[in-house]
């Protein structure tokens, strides 16, 4: 491996990712590129090849990023080395997108020829521009009956401000236009800058746990060279490890003699503990370390918190291990142990959003075989106390005594909703019902409107996305970012069963909606909790004040069945005896609460009032 060869090779490297809104054909395009460059034989080819998680295939979304090396012989006769880094399109996985873009020089922007630009397309384009990437717009699905490539070309220029005159019309499904895209990558995406002779600097953009080889780092080499036998050092904590193997993905892992500047591949170095490596950290060589780390990623703060508890309490330690392994390549997942009187031992977890929460729950249940109970999600509130102190509260059961609270502030998001004109009314009505404040509205073209609202995050984590989809027949697209904290009239609502508070059912609610939400919940719980041998009152309370109540009637055995005719006082005596027995039972009996009860707090819905 002489330096000249390495420098020549570096000029032939092109690192790029594909960015798109959900369902605009990103994974299909990646499949076609793999086929065209003959990276994957037709025998191994399957739809959504890079979406290796079952969950990704079933939901038709990309959750984790994937990096792959391809060789392409261009029209100029030269062979180029492409690194394709696949990215998720959903708003909850923006962090994954920003990580993969940091490892690239170019991005292919896929826009659906029928649907045009959507909210998340915009969000991801801005991320790409922040990373100074060369953006190549392409217009996909031109074989659809509703396709209108010219309108979309105009939209790309007007809304994003990119020159779309050379945007390639493609159909990833039919394989049209793939070669033009590959040629554009060669011409327009710059080769990686970086110095082979400089000390090693490699950016960790993902990591996976292998039970035999420990933690395997996925890296982009920015400067220098790394090979088996080297001793690497993590720049964040100074820990050192001996490299056992380096290589690339095609999608299968293939060992190599070295990784040099511009390469995207993996390093295995028998790293045993998950905590020693952090995504966004810089790897360097121990004997000739780089003077400073690369600019990593901005740390993502979780927005939504929920309790996760194993249904079988013996699996508490398994759950901890599962969370640690998921955290390894999902740096945005945070968790800490917590206990609940109702649910026992579990963890309080922080997520980027509801889809993220959903995906983590499903991955734990599938990959680690642990059945879970999740509590209702909540957000982080700033609570200003009367003594001048400010505390952050993410768990409703930790809310301080209301008499000591001066004000409560909640997070608001700037929600950008793109929607066809005929649904604007429905969107505005929904946003207002969710305590949203109108900001602005502009027309993208004759038919589509971009509406911006400020909405409390707590309203969005409930069911905003589902409601938005159903009120616009699925045509709306939605993206949000945290904008500010605002003071709100919020109260903590407790649910009492049989006079006892159930901590896992507590939630924070706006004072205005407290009564109706309390009523909805007690009525729902009444339907869900099975009848007991004794009467069970369900109450919703704010502080000491009960705002709603519903009773589950007791199951009664007919004690009069064998008392034919006879004196009324005899019947009364039997009934009194039954009553006394029930009373005794109530004092010692506890109420079984099924899992649906916790979820019912989640799916509280205005429709339930009807």
Curated annotation (Swiss-Prot):
What is the designated name of this protein? Elongation factor 4
A GO biological process of this protein is: positive regulation of translation
GO cellular component annotations of the record: plasma membrane
Q: Which residues cross the membrane?
A: none
- UniProt keyword terms in alphabetical order: Cell membrane, GTP-binding, Hydrolase, Membrane, Nucleotide-binding, Protein biosynthesis
**Which Enzyme Commission number(s) are listed?**
3.6.5.n1
* Main subcellular localisation: membrane
Q: Where is the tr-type G domain?
A: 11-193
- Of which family is this protein a member? Belongs to the TRAFAC class translation factor GTPase superfamily. Classic translation factor GTPase family. LepA subfamily.
GO MF annotations, alphabetized = GTP binding; GTPase activity; ribosome binding; translation elongation factor activity
Q: Where does GTP bind?
A: 23-28, 140-143
The UniProt entry, under PROSITE patterns, shows: G_TR_1, G_TR_2
Keyword rRNA-binding among UniProt keywords: no
- Gene designation: lepA
The record describes its membrane topology as: Peripheral membrane protein
Q: In which compartments does the protein localize?
A: Cell membrane
Described function: Required for accurate and efficient protein synthesis under certain stress conditions. May act as a fidelity factor of the translation reaction, by catalyzing a one-codon backward translocation of tRNAs on improperly translocated ribosomes. Back-translocation proceeds from a post-translocation (POST) complex to a pre-translocation (PRE) complex, thus giving elongation factor G a second chance to translocate the tRNAs correctly. Binds to ribosomes in a GTP-dependent manner.
- Quickly give the catalysed reaction: GTP + H2O = GDP + phosphate + H(+)
